[in-house]
A protein has these predicted regions:
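Inter-lobe coupling linker of SF2 helicases/translocases
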Residues: 1-97
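Conserved residues at beta->alpha junctions
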Residues: 25-28, 104, 143, 165
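Generic structural signal for small/hydrophobic residues in well-ordered secondary structure
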Residues: 27, 61-62, 88, 92, ...
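Short, glycine/serine-rich, charged loops/turns that create anion-binding
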Residues: 69, 107, 145
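Short, well-ordered alpha-helical scaffold segments within catalytic/effector domains
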Residues: 81-89, 107, 125-128, 172
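Conserved RecA-like ASCE P-loop NTPase motor core of nucleic-acid helicases/translocases
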Residues: 98-106
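Conserved RecA-like P-loop NTPase helicase motor core
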Residues: 110, 118-188
Length: 188
């Protein structure tokens, strides 16, 4: 038996996909909180303590901290910084009015994004139709629920990852919501 595997880019004319990494730097105090937590697996924030019981929990909480907030054991959110939100604001402004799709991972990321920006979640078929018609300026999606099967390429060509996932599959599939057959513009 012979198996042939082909990528869509092998036989479809696709626009360019540009991956643009935007570094976000913490202040010295914020970096100290991050580093202390990474080393000690416990940190005191104001009146509450955040701890990680093992390396897997530590990894997830460090990812949360890098995004700007972290959950404690009671699922209460503790804000660390707004640096990613500031960078997100710059990127949205830099899109010069073009529609922007934002991928988030943690619920506290979504809450903070919704509090700061006028965004709409892509959750229903009406949301998808409105996005593809160009009626949504800034939309948010969660890779686990929007990573497969959605056709969002008609609504825009800019995807911003506010927080990354550990899943390469979800990352690639979410990117493929915009960079797919039918997209006319360079995907950023």
């Amino acid at each position: 038996d012979i198996t042939i595997s082909m990528k869509s880019t092998d036989f479809l004319k696709m626009p360019e996909c540009v991956i643009n990494e935007v570094p976000v730097y913490l202040s010295p105090d914020e970096q100290d909180i991050y580093d202390t937590f990474r080393e000690d697996m416990v940190i005191k924030l104001k009146t509450d303590e955040i701890d990680a019981v093992n390396a897997a929990v530590l990894s997830g909480k460090l990812l949360q901290m890098a995004n700007g907030a972290v959950y404690d054991e009671d699922s209460k959110t503790h804000q660390i910084h707004d640096r990613k939100l500031d960078a997100l604001e710059d990127l949205i402004e830099g899109a010069n009015g073009k529609p922007v799709l934002i991928a988030y991972w943690y619920n506290h990321d979504l809450e903070r994004i919704c509090k700061r920006f006028d965004v709409r979640q892509i959750k229903t078929s009406k949301d998808i139709a409105d996005w593809n018609s160009g009626n949504i300026q800034v939309a948010v999606i969660h890779p686990a629920s929007a990573g497969h099967g959605l056709n969002l390429q008609s609504g825009g060509s800019t995807l911003i990852w506010f927080g990354l996932t550990w899943s390469l599959e979800l990352y690639q599939q979410t990117n493929a919501r915009l960079w797919r057959q039918g997209q006319r513009d360079t995907v950023v």
